[in-house]
């Protein structure tokens, strides 16, 4: 989210279900089966993720992250989260305290965070069956329905729902909005949260509120000329095209596709369709959700221009605008192509950008499951930035907004608009806090995919897959990336011949795959998928070994500035509380692993020994990621 203040047919029965409890709409639904069936199949998709609840994390750092976020989701007071909605829609706030930060009663785009909470609660319920999270989501939906039903008394048009007046949209359309609000950004979050409660909890009340609000968007935007709409799109609008395309896919009603396509931003899409990099100077996280929308619009329509936009955007961003940890942007903005070493600052790598790039990567993988580069990037960003985004010392799993890459950087940096260090229970509500809630409640969603009877293994972490469609259970056991080995045991109705495809990352060499201790004679070329086709027996154990080594990753714009990687892991230097005025000069030949039981290394920098460790664990101390290697 930018710190710049300058950037920023109706459905008739929209509020008719306000008296129906959302909790009632999920009674009898098991979390794994509550999701509604989409009305339309995605076009061009040849790999499919497993549903929430089919993959469970087991004891690991990743499960710890999930549990900390779950603690916060169970703790947070829904009455406080409802304060701005109730006040705006002229209902009693029931004596609740108001929030601070980006959800304060006078903050321009207050009420954006609540959609993230809805999504995260629904995900936790779908994954774990947590009824506290289910009930919080149900209560919020019921109260949002009451707010929406009171629009007549509040002076709003049918279907409208948010924490600020509808008049902000009139100002947006007139080009006079100057209070810092990004109103469609907020509407996107609310729509997405309601959609997820419908999909993952089976809540028909969430569906009705969702379609009421979507109907309002259709009415509001349908009155504008194409030129007026493109002017509206100059203000950040999140992933409106993505969520409306999702609603189209969910309902099969072409009205929502028509509405989605009104949010196709020509000034951004046209250059990308021609594979032109014009990202320099653009607010980064304003763009990435649009790219996700292009991918979803391709899957909804089959129009290859949308696919090209999404794919070109991914290639341009990852290859020319991405730091070694997988994040992008400095001060929330894209810089010139390949400008990496030139922008090693305290305000690099806004968390939202990386979260959304992971979403885009996942969508593109479903279209091209043979392209290993997609999940090589996914793993790099997921592990090095997003796992480390969360403060492991905080039982509520609070997060950093930026991940600093300056010499002697330290996690715990808030946004320019509001400042701070880590997010808090009630006084932050940044965009990155919201996406963090989503991130750390779905860490398991991209470990495995399926393509017909083929199982695809993309990520290596302790987990259990219940492939219920086939009666197969896959148990993955590993200490990766401390170890270079993972095992996958298949049990259940595994008989017959079928294929397991395993990602062989581009950074490895000499990878091996064995079954029940016997090395298999299959191709394990780095940057490919190894294909293991066999007649299976319950209990068969696949062992995957991916040898790791130190590789220096030079910055795109300066061959003498580089980061240290070991397998998928970025290694950073631990400088305690020492400040650094410049990049330390590293003796690259001195890098030595000092423990087989951890990723502990040492090296010589500026003539002194420095400890190195995995960047995702670099907490509570000043660190260094990029090094001066000009003396080597």
Predicted regions and their residues:
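N-terminal secretory signal peptides and thylakoid transit peptides that target proteins
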Residues: 1-18
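Low-complexity, Ser/Thr/Pro/Gly-enriched N-terminal "stalk/linker" regions
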Residues: 19, 24-25, 35-113, 138-171, ...
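Long, well-ordered core segments of solenoidal/helical folds
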Residues: 65-97, 137-156, 208-225, 255-275, ...
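Carbohydrate-binding/catalytic loop surfaces
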Residues: 83-107, 158-181, 231-247, 274-296, ...
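Extended ligand-binding groove/face enriched in aromatic
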Residues: 99-103, 125-262
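Well-ordered alpha-helical segments within folded domains of soluble proteins
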Residues: 109-126, 182-198, 233-248, 282-299, ...
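Active-site neighborhood of glycoside hydrolase catalytic domains
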Residues: 237, 246-270, 287-325, 353-356, ...
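C-terminal beta-rich recognition modules with glycine/proline-rich loops and embedded aromatic residues
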Residues: 260, 310, 375-389, 394-489, ...
